[in-house]
Amino acid sequence: MPSPSKDRQPIRAGDVLHPVHPGEVLAEEFLGPLGLSQNRAALAMRVPARRVNEIVHGKRSVTADTALRLARYFGTTPEFWVNLQAHYDLEVARDASGARIASEVMTLGEAA
């Protein structure tokens, strides 16, 4: 079994896991392993380098347009990128508001 990288530690019971931003996937699963710079990818996708940089650093969301471009460039599907973003957004919202919403909103059965 491969050992964790120097940046990653084994997951232990009780650990709180942060949501994974699509930019982290882009950097760690695509750019890094393929030896691609953010600038090179941006040029090939015909987007500003700043867009790729902000996505990689979790400061920008993957839009439908960017998902189409990432999919074309890396040979994936746009749904892959959009689903990563949607999952991230839901996890962030759940962490921020999930408990409050659960206490405020009645279920259909409770409201009847």
Report the location of each language-model feature.
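Short, basic-rich loop-to-helix N-cap that marks the start of a DNA-contacting helix
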Residues: K59-R72
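N-terminal flexible/basic segments that precede or flank functional cores
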Residues: M1-E28, P33-L34, I101-V105, E110-A112
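Residue-level signal for the short linker/turn that defines the boundary of a DNA-recognition helix
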Residues: G35-L36, D65
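Short, charged recognition helix plus adjacent turn
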Residues: V82-A112
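Alpha-helical residues within the helix-turn-helix
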Residues: G32, L43, R72
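The DNA-recognition helices of helix-turn-helix-type DNA-binding domains
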Residues: P48, K59, F74, Q85-Y88
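Short alpha-helical DNA-recognition segment
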Residues: L36-E54
